Amino acid sequence: KVIGVVSERASAETGIPADASIVRGTGDNPAAAICTGCLLEGIPTISLGTSGVLMYSAEGVELPDVGKPVLFKWGNTLKTQVQLSIRSCGGAKEWWYGQILDSDSYDLEDKAVEDPFYEMRDLMFYPHLSGEKVLHGCPSVRGAFLGLDLDTTRSELERALMEGTAYALRELKESVNHSQEWFGIRLVGGGAKNDFWAQTLSNVLGIDLVRMESSGAGQGAALLALSAS
């Protein structure tokens, strides 16, 4: 919806043309849901960003048992987009590389660890580095590596980190009553560009993932602006 126009003063300060329409926007995840088909086609979506967000939509107004509802009106259609998230997803990788490895490279040192049959010896990562707000509602919960031994390598720890975030997203998915009816999930965000992480997520969820290479919040916001009246 158009809620106003750019004033002469704002135009002079920003360079945006005067009288350009100002369109009511939305948050980054609802915007991403527009261009992935989550909102209008009902296709579940996962955004792998700093946080990991699982989104699905429902007709009309729905108050879910788990997750945050976001009401959307598209034309004459009222939808509810439900968001469930883990707070540390890509953020956990940033912590690992920035604080632990002090490295700018996001590549595994040992490519053998990417083999799906690689023996991980029950090494697990609990990803809630900054609390958990959906299933447990506990801001003080913290992350952990479980199963460490003297032979554990840095690449194994990184694989465990990606697997741990995948299992946390699986826990969110299983909290949605009808998620067993989903036949596929679309994947967006910076983490979606990592082939190994995307495949790990698909394996853990037990469902096909389709990466949306050019979809994201920016594109969704542009579609909102294009459809405004």
Language model feature labels by segment:
Residues 2:
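Glycine-rich, mobile lid/loop segments that gate access to catalytic sites or pores
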